[in-house]
Amino acid sequence: MSTQKPLIALAAGGTGGHVFPAEALASVLLDRGYRLALITDKRGAAYGGTLGKLETFRISAGGIAGRGKLSALRSALELGLGLIQARSILGRIRPAAVIGFGGYASVPGMGAAALAGIPTAIHEQNAVLGRANRLLAGHVRRIATSFAEVSHVEPKLAPKLVHTGMPVRAAILASRDASYAGITAEGPIELLVLGGSQGARILSEVIPAALARLPEALRTRIRIAQQCRPEDLEGVRRAYDGTGIDATLDSFFADVPERLARAHLVIARAGASTVAELTTLGRPAILVPYPFAVDDHQTANAHAAEDCGGAWLMQQDSFTADSLAARLDSLFTHPEALVRTAVCARNVGRPDAAEALADLVVGLIPNESGA
C-alpha cells in the first residue's frame, strides 16, 4: 500500500519576481509526488500555469511600511487579519512545511506557520534581503538565496543561509543546450532588449538613438527584438525608420527563451529573474538597473553579475546614446569579449536551482530527507 506524501504550503503573491520561483518549485515538488497548497493574496486568483492548478487560499495582506499613518494602520490591520486567516487555514490543511517567497503577501502565512511551529524557509530572489524576508528571517529555519552573497542579513542569521540559486522556467532550461554562437565577421548581430514586466521607457529612448550612431557597416547587420511599452511602440518604430536596422518591436514576447538562446547580446533591467535566465543560458548582457527599486536591489543584482564577469553594468543616469553607442561599437567589433562574458555568465548559472530548493524544503520535513 502506497503512503501519501506530505503536504507542503507555498506562501507567495504579488509581482512576478516572487511568483516565478514558486512556480518552478511547485513543478519539481509535484513531480516528486508531494501535495501542495498555495497561500496568497487577492492577486493569486489570477495565476495560471502550475500555481493555478493548486488548492489556493486567499488571505488579506498589507504592505510592510505605509507611506503615512493611515496607510500604515491599514496595512497593520490587513496583516493582522491575514495572520488570523492563515492560522485557521494551516490548522485545517496541516502542512508539513511552509516556504515563502518574499513580498508582503507571504508575511501572514509565514508568520502563522512560525507561530504554529511548522518547519519554514524563505527564498530571497535578489542580492539584497527584501523587507518582508527581513521581517521573517529570524523566525524561519532556512533562508535560501539566489545569489552567493546577499546584503542586509544580520550576522547571527548567516548559519541559516543556503545558496540554492534562482529557479527559472522550464522553457529556459530547455534552451540551455543551445551553446552561445559568437558574432561572425559578416553575419547578422542578434540584439535582444527586455524592459521588465512593463517595458522601460529609458531603453526605448536611448537604444534606437545609440544604434543610429553606429557605423553603417555594423548598423545594417543588426537584427533587434525590443520590448517596449505599448504607448512607446510607434515612436520607437519611427526612430528605427531609415537606419537600415531590422527591428522587431512588441510589448510582449511569448518566445523569450528562444530569443535569449539566439541573442548575441541582451540589454535589460536587472531583475532577479532576468539575471537568473541570462546566467542559466550563458548570455552576455548590458544591465541597466531600475534606480527606484526598493533598497536599490537591481543595482546589487547587476553588480553581482558584473563582478563575476557575466555582464556589464550601466547606471541609468549615465545610460546615454553616446555612451551606449561607444560600448556597442567596441563589443561588436571585438566580439571575443562577448564570448568571454557568455562563458562567465554560464559558469555562475544554477540550472539546478529548483531541484536544490526542493531538496532544502524536503529536508525540513522529518523522515523526508533524501526522499
From Swiss-Prot:
The EC number(s) this enzyme carries: 2.4.1.227
UniProt catalytic activity: di-trans,octa-cis-undecaprenyl diphospho-N-acetyl-alpha-D-muramoyl-L-alanyl-D-glutamyl-meso-2,6-diaminopimeloyl-D-alanyl-D-alanine + UDP-N-acetyl-alpha-D-glucosamine = di-trans,octa-cis-undecaprenyl diphospho-[N-acetyl-alpha-D-glucosaminyl-(1->4)]-N-acetyl-alpha-D-muramoyl-L-alanyl-D-glutamyl-meso-2,6-diaminopimeloyl-D-alanyl-D-alanine + UDP + H(+)
One annotated GO biological process: cell wall organization
Subcellular localization(s) per the UniProt record: Cell inner membrane
Cross-referenced InterPro entries: GlcNAc_MurG, Glyco_trans_28_C, GlycoTrans_28_N
HAMAP family in the record: MurG (MF_00033)
Name listed for the protein in its UniProt record: UDP-N-acetylglucosamine--N-acetylmuramyl-(pentapeptide) pyrophosphoryl-undecaprenol N-acetylglucosamine transferase
